[in-house]
Regions:
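Short, Lys/Arg-enriched N-terminal segments with co-localized hydrophobic residues
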Residues: 11-26
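Intrinsically disordered, low-complexity segments enriched in small/polar residues
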Residues: 7-10, 173
Length: 180
């Protein structure tokens, strides 16, 4: 008869996974912001490429998928926007962190946020027009593509400005004395 023995490493693995969960639950807004801020940038890029492909190929299925992706990117932008102020409060007094960079990033992020939310609203209206087989659905989807492209550009700029807050190596001139 064979006795089953537990692998001594399994306790360590379970403890590590519980520690990871606990660490996740105890993250501050700066941690969360760093994790979620890439989603709207990459999401809007994916969405505009999918929507653009659908419109160019005149594929209603791809166009609708692109519109849903724009809508999803708009929803997923909310956590990044909601954690930004808390993240700023945490890092603003750290060494080599410029309040001017934080303010520039916040202003750029707000513009990108509202552009993406506008694109998401247009995407929702486009989907409703597609559902009712309106001839204007494609035109509104094209307008959604234009606004989604604008939002991607604004969000990418905001992301670059946000990266400069802690990554001095990407600042122009590697950080000037007035930024320190």
């Amino acid at each position: 008869m064979r006795t089953s023995r537990r692998d001594p490493g399994s306790f360590v693995k379970r403890a590590a996974s519980h520690e990871s969960i606990l660490h996740f639950l105890l993250m501050n807004q700066a941690h969360i912001h760093l994790i979620v801020n890439h989603v709207p940038i990459l999401g809007s890029l994916f969405a505009l490429l999918l929507l653009g492909a659908g419109l160019v190929m005149r594929s209603e299925i791809l166009t609708k998928a692109g519109l849903v992706a724009v809508l999803a990117a708009g929803l997923l932008c909310l956590p990044a926007q909601l954690t930004g102020e808390g993240a700023a409060e945490i890092v603003q007094d750290m060494p080599r962190v410029s309040r001017a960079l934080i303010q520039n990033h916040a202003a750029a992020a707000e513009k990108g946020f509202w552009a993406l939310e506008s694109a998401a609203a247009l995407a929702l209206f486009s989907l409703l027009l597609f559902k009712s087989a309106s001839p204007r659905a494609r035109l509104l989807a094209l307008l959604t593509l234009v606004v989604a492209t604008l939002s991607f550009g604004l969000l990418a700029r905001a992301g670059n400005l946000g990266g400069q807050i802690r990554h001095t190596e990407i600042r122009d001139g590697f950080g000037t004395p007035d930024e320190l």
